[in-house]
């Protein structure tokens, strides 16, 4: 049984060890590299509507 996937460098390792229903703080969900943040932190609330 493989515990960690090959792309574990993209996300914190605790996500893969998470027990269903356990709360993860936002600090553990944020990417380590700032180059990923524009892609992962796109919130529909913060984006401009397409009709503007």
UniProtKB/Swiss-Prot annotation:
Transmembrane segments: none
Stored InterPro entries: Alpha-crystallin_N (IPR003090)
Keywords: Eye lens protein
A Pfam family annotated for this UniProt entry: Crystallin
Task of the protein: May contribute to the transparency and refractive index of the lens.
Similarity comment: Belongs to the small heat shock protein (HSP20) family.
Quaternary data: Homodimer. Aggregates with homologous proteins, including alpha-A-crystallin and the small heat shock protein HSPB1, to form large heteromeric complexes.
Protein name per UniProt: Alpha-crystallin B chain
Phylogenetic lineage: Eukaryota, Metazoa, Chordata, Craniata, Vertebrata
